[in-house]
């Protein structure tokens, strides 16, 4: 029976590839169903002989507890956007300045969810979302239900590939029809539907929604020499690869392709929002390298956004964490790119003056980058009032006089004690990419302010459980949970703290680069502007901003208070070079941890030289198991893998 099961799996996977990926079915649906039922019956009788690539794995039926974080071995970078032909020409000039004979591979930009698939010995062992590019979510079980993703490859390869998971238009219409019949809210657009589906805890729902993929990148080291060859290799491995792409020798040919696809866009069976242009030669890609945020060898041209008319009702002015006062328009509701829009950014006071926006104007609204609603221009022929918009002279939060610096487009509150700035700064400090203090969100920050318990980020670490119990709706359990999260954040690597301080122009990636260079925040604070500006991919703007921040007495007092409170100021990655107790080991975390958050545990393991994986396999060296560990612990025991508890990790 084992041989017959293997034969059926091979046949069914081949037929599925012909149907879902190649679009060339060689057998009828009834014949496929007959073979599928035969396999299912055999697997029910002989469960120990079920093969890892059996198509029955795609049916669903498993309820997941949640999604673990998944650290990407190979980071996923976002792409620089272009919105005009001029921006594409500028990109081409930058590339050709170093490589005059370059050619470009142009691919459709699928409007879905970025995914990463990892295969070991040809078997799919992990599938994850992009997340922040460094850490995503492990959605392996859900991706196994996407019918055009191979569970096994033709060859026993160790390979990581990247692509886009999307919901075809026909599937989107069918899903929304069903939701309408069931009285459920409809998805706004196929991208939201795909993202929502992949985060379902019930894998059976994923299986029913007919998601699809296009793969386009081999993230792990490759033996081929061009992006075109990468696509051919992926297709040869039975991945679904979009056949609509061209190799262009000039930016003029790229633009012709863009114009052609723009005309055909609405007739495609899936949503796209642009064209991705990549240098074809992989060796040239490597030479060009990256900025902090994006590759220098690629750019994403975004199609012009949909535009709608709406009437301006009023304007709200809000203060951000850097003191910038931003105007937001309240509008008559309009449907825009699949969602109802009733608020849109007006950017800044200079923008209002430039566009001559007045009270009760009819305006054109669009979604900047297909995400953020913004006012584009006024429809002057429909103007009903000559009355100018009222621009505030004082801060809407602290009532300090606002300033408008000559070199800035926005109004700014420069009061360092402005409550709105401090609150926004605290929210940023506690956010996931900064200190990751679970439970310290906007509502709790508001309560802390109302009780006068916190005035700056150092005040977070002076909070006691008794303080937290003073907050409205806080019981002992919630107070203990937040207090534990605050204490755990003290052990974060210092790049999180640096990002959390909210220094202008210093993002999370720049923070990591800076701490890799200077090892701790005190040394960074003493570095000269020239030393910082000399770091590849940073430059003078970041150097000036850091110098301005650290020369302020208040900043030095804040750092001293944080250090006194026990907050770590060191870059933990340097410990790996010193003691690397787990150097080269593949470690898996499972279960609930009590002393550390999962991200902190991963950072500690990585600082000790470990590669942290989201799944257990024969290549796993060690499993750290917390409370209520489930299938991963069982699999580790079955494979004879060393198992340790959280106390062991804490002792390292």
Curated annotation (Swiss-Prot):
Residues that bind Zn(2+): 395, 398, 413, 418
EC number: 6.5.1.2
Binding site for NAD(+): 29-33, 78-79, 107, 130, 164, 278, 302
InterPro entries, sorted: BRCT_dom, BRCT_dom_sf, DisA/LigA_HHH, DNA_ligase, DNA_ligase_AS, DNA_ligase_CS, DNAligase_adenylation, DNAligase_N
Entry's transmembrane regions: none
Record GO biological process: DNA repair; DNA replication
Keywords attached to this entry: DNA damage, DNA repair, DNA replication, Ligase, Magnesium, Manganese, Metal-binding, NAD, Zinc
Catalytic reaction list: NAD(+) + (deoxyribonucleotide)n-3'-hydroxyl + 5'-phospho-(deoxyribonucleotide)m = (deoxyribonucleotide)n+m + AMP + beta-nicotinamide D-nucleotide
GO MF entry, a single one: DNA ligase (NAD+) activity
Positions of the catalytic residues: 109 (n6-amp-lysine intermediate)
Keyword Repeat included in the entry's annotation: no
One Pfam family here: HHH_5
Gene Ontology cellular-component terms listed: cytosol
Chain coiled-coil ranges: none
Cofactor(s) listed: Mg(2+); Mn(2+)
Domain BRCT, chain residue ranges per copy: 577-652
Similarity comment: Belongs to the NAD-dependent DNA ligase family. LigA subfamily.
Job description of the protein: DNA ligase that catalyzes the formation of phosphodiester linkages between 5'-phosphoryl and 3'-hydroxyl groups in double-stranded DNA using NAD as a coenzyme and as the energy source for the reaction. It is essential for DNA replication and repair of damaged DNA.
Name of the protein this chain belongs to: DNA ligase
Species assigned in the record: Streptococcus sanguinis (strain SK36)
């Amino acid at each position: 029976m084992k041989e017959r099961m293997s034969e059926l799996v091979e046949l069914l996977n081949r037929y599925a590839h012909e149907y879902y990926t190649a679009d060339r079915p060689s057998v009828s649906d009834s014949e496929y169903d007959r073979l599928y039922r035969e396999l299912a019956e055999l697997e029910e009788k002989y469960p120990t002989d079920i093969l890892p690539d059996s198509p029955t794995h795609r049916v669903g039926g498993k309820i997941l507890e949640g999604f673990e974080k998944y650290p990407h071995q190979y980071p996923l970078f976002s792409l620089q956007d272009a919105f005009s032909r001029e921006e594409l020409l500028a990109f081409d000039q930058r590339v050709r300045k170093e490589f005059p004979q370059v050619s470009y591979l142009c691919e459709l930009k699928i409007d879905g969810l970025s995914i990463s698939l990892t295969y070991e010995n040809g078997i799919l062992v992990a599938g994850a979302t992009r997340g922040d590019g460094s850490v995503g979510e492990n959605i392996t079980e859900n991706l196994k239900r996407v019918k055009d993703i191979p569970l096994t490859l033709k060859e026993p390869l160790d390979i990581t590939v990247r692509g886009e998971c999307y919901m075809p238009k026909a599937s989107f219409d069918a899903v929304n029809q069903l939701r309408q019949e069931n009285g459920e809210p409809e998805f706004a657009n196929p991208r939201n539907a795909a993202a929502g589906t992949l985060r379902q805890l019930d894998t059976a729902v994923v299986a029913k929604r007919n998601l699809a993929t296009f793969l386009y990148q081999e993230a792990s080291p490759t033996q081929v020499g061009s992006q075109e060859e990468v696509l051919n290799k992926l297709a040869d491995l039975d991945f679904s690869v979009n056949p609509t792409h061209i190799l262009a020798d000039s930016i003029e040919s790229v633009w012709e392709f863009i114009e052609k696809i723009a005309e055909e866009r609405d007739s495609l069976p899936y949503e796209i929002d642009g064209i991705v242009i990549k240098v074809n030669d992989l060796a040239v890609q490597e030479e060009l390298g990256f900025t902090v945020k994006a590759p220098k060898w690629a750019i994403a041209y975004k199609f012009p956004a949909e535009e709608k008319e709406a009437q301006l009702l009023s304007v709200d002015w809000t203060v951000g964490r850097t003191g910038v006062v931003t105007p937001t328009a309240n509008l008559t509701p309009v449907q825009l790119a699949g969602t109802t829009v009733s608020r849109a950014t007006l950017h800044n006071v200079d923008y209002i003056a430039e566009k001559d926006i007045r009270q009760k104007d009819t305006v054109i609204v669009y979604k900047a980058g297909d995400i953020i609603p913004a006012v584009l221009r006024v429809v002057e022929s429909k103007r009903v009032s000559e009355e100018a918009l009222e621009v505030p002279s004082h801060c809407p939060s602290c009532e300090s006089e606002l300033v408008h610096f000559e070199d800035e487009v926005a109004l700014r509150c420069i009061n360092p004690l402005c409550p709105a700035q401090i609150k926004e700064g605290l929210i940023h400090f506690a956010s996931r990419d900064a200190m990751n203090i679970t439970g310290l969100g906007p509502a709790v920050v508001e309560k802390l302010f109302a009780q006068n318990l916190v005035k700056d980020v150092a005040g977070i670490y002076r909070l006691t459980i008794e303080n937290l119990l003073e907050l409205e709706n806080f019981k002992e359990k919630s107070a203990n949970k937040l207090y534990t999260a605050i204490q755990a954040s003290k052990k974060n690597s210092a790049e999180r703290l640096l990002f959390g301080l909210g220094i202008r122009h210093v993002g999370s990636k720049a923070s990591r680069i800076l701490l890799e260079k200077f090892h701790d925040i005190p040394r960074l604070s003493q570095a000269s502007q020239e030393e910082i500006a000399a770091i590849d991919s940073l430059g003078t703007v970041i150097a000036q901003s850091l110098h301005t921040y650290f020369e302020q007495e208040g900043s030095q007092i804040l750092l001293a208070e944080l250090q006194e409170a026990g907050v770590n100021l060191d870059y933990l990655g340097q410990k790996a070079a010193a003691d690397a107790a787990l150097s080269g080991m593949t470690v898996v975390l499972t279960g609930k941890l009590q002393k550390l958050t999962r991200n902190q545990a991963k950072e500690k393991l990585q600082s000790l030289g470990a590669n942290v994986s989201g799944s257990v396999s024969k290549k796993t060296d060690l499993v750290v198991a917390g409370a209520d560990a489930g299938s991963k612990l069982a699999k580790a025991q079955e494979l004879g893998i060393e198992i340790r508890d959280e106390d062991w990790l804490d002792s390292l």
